[in-house]
C-alpha cells in the first residue's frame, strides 16, 4: 500500500491550523475571563478582611474602656474601705451598687453595638460572597460544568444510603428531579443509572428545570428532598464567618466575669 505524503502533510497542516484557531478564539478569551473573575474575587476578599480588622480594633477599644472602668471602680471601692464604721459600710455598698448599675448599662450598650456591627459585617460578607459566586457561576455555566454538577449529585445519591431509600419509599407523588439548568440525556441517564444500580429503583422519574435551583439539584418525593448545591458550600462559609464574629463576644463576656469576681 502506497503512503500518500501529500495527504499526510495536508492533514497535519489542518490540525495545526485548528489548534491555533482554538487557542486564539476559544481558550484565550475563556482563560482571560477566569483570571479577571479571580482578581475581582481577591479584591472583594481583601475588603472583607479589612472589615474584620476594623471590627477587631473596635473590640480592643471596648476592652480598654472596660479596663479603665474597672480601675475607676477599684479606686471607688478603695476610698470606701477607708471610711470608718457604718458610714464606711454604707458608702461602700452605695458605691458598689452604682458601679454594678453603670457596668451593667455599659456592658449592655457595648454588646448591642458589637452585635449590630457583627450582623452588618456578616451580612455584607454573605451578600458579597453569594453575589460574586453567583456571578462566577453564570459566567462559567456551560455543558461541561452542568455535567460535573450532575456527576456530583449522582455521587451524593450513592452516598445517601438510608436517606435515599426512605425518600424512594415515601411515595404519594411522582419522583421529581429539579435543577437550575436543562439536563442533557447523558446527565439524565447517569441519575437513572445511579438510582437503578445503587437502590434498584426503575420507576418513573420526572425532570424539571427551575430558575430557583440555579447552582443546585434536588430529588424530591412525598415531601422529602435530597439536595446538592453550590449554595450549601457557601452556607458553610457563612457559618464560619458568623462563628468568627461571635468568638470575640464570648471572650469579652468571660473577661468581664473575671473582672466582676476581682471587684467583689
From Swiss-Prot:
The keyword Transmembrane applies. It is a single-pass membrane protein. Residues 240-264 are annotated as: Disordered. One of its GO terms (molecular function) is proton-transporting ATPase activity, rotational mechanism. PANTHER family: ATP SYNTHASE SUBUNIT B', CHLOROPLASTIC. F-type ATPases have 2 components, F(1) - the catalytic core - and F(0) - the membrane proton channel. F(1) has five subunits: alpha(3), beta(3), gamma(1), delta(1), epsilon(1). F(0) has four main subunits: a(1), b(2) and c(10-14). The alpha and beta chains form an alternating ring which encloses part of the gamma chain. F(1) is attached to F(0) by a central stalk formed by the gamma and epsilon chains, while a peripheral stalk is formed by the delta and b chains. This is ATP synthase subunit b 1. The lineage of its organism: Bacteria, Pseudomonadati, Chlorobiota, Chlorobiia, Chlorobiales. The gene is atpF1.
